[in-house]
């Protein structure tokens, strides 16, 4: 029984390390408020959240997506790998949406620390930061599935 617990502990450490390593390979980490139930999210789901096609979590709480400033390397990588467009193309899309009166883009934070603080204080928030950004209590990373 004790060896099974030891094996499970080792496995948990390996899986956690692999999850963080894969996030670092991406260059960004998706973060949510600790009160959020989310443990993993697909790139398709992220796309819908950040393009505001999904506006509520399954709990009914409003989704509040927050982007990094447009000149951030993590934002460019997020835009390319999740949205499938460059940051400039995403901004052009949102300008068209705003002009036509169909919506507004996610809030844009000036720094990674601002994203972390916003997500920590906003229960329905989801954001992303570079993989090297330290996370604080009240915020946790979620695994991104392809």
Task: Go through the PLM ranges and name each one.
Residues 1-5:
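Positively charged n-region of N-terminal signal peptides that target proteins for export
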Residues 7-16:
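Bacterial N-terminal signal peptides
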Residues 18-23:
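Sec/Tat signal peptide C-region and signal peptidase I cleavage site
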Residues 24-146:
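Exported/periplasmic ABC-transporter solute-binding proteins
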């Amino acid at each position: 029984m004790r060896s099974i617990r030891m094996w499970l502990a080792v496995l948990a450490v390996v899986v956690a390390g692999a999850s963080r390593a894969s996030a670092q390979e991406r260059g960004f980490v998706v973060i949510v408020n600790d009160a959020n139930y989310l443990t993993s999210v697909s790139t398709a789901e992220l796309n819908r959240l950040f393009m505001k096609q999904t506006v509520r979590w399954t709990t009914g709480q409003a989704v509040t997506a927050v982007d990094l400033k447009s000149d951030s390397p993590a934002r460019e990588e997020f835009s390319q790998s999740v949205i499938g467009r460059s940051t400039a193309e995403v901004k052009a899309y949102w300008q068209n949406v705003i002009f036509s009166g169909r919506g507004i883009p996610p809030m844009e934070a000036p720094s990674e620390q601002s994203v972390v603080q916003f997500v920590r204080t906003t229960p329905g928030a989801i954001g992303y930061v570079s993989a090297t950004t330290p996370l604080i209590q009240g915020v946790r990373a979620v695994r991104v599935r392809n």
